[in-house]
Amino acid sequence: HEIANVMGTDGIEYMLQATEDLPVDVRFMLPSCVPATPLDESGANLDYRAIDSFYDHPRVQGLAEMMNFVGTINGDPQVVEKIVASQAHHKKIDGHAPDLVGNDLNAYIAAGVYSDHECADIDDAMKKLKLGQFIMIREGTAARNLEALMPLIKSQKYFSRCMFCTD
């Protein structure tokens, strides 16, 4: 989503074109929050209409980390429009929900958020797994959660609902 924060849809188009015909298969999730917060100044303001046509691209997999968990939980119309558009195209919605619990977590997942990469400990990951989410285990420069979440990988019960990511 960073390139969209700077360049808007031109940035998304650039990334799709720049990764064509590479020896690796590069897939994309569309930015959910551009700008990242209502107070941010950004190179663009992308609503669901701005990104909708990108869902038809074969390498676009869905909507990236829905960072506006407050808007998701409270049914903010702009957030709901983005979620509904992604679902209408039969695409996934990745999450970004640190420390959500209880009814807030239930509402967030019920909105259709498929996964989360913000689990820093096993308890948070287990809550989300039991509610049906997939867990992205981060091991990168900003966060290192592999050691804390290793029991999920070792578990016969949960390893198939886990994946690795750098952010």
Which residue stretches match the model-derived regions?
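Divalent-metal coordination cores built from histidine and acidic residues
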Residues: 1-90
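Active-site core of metal-dependent hydrolases
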Residues: 65-167
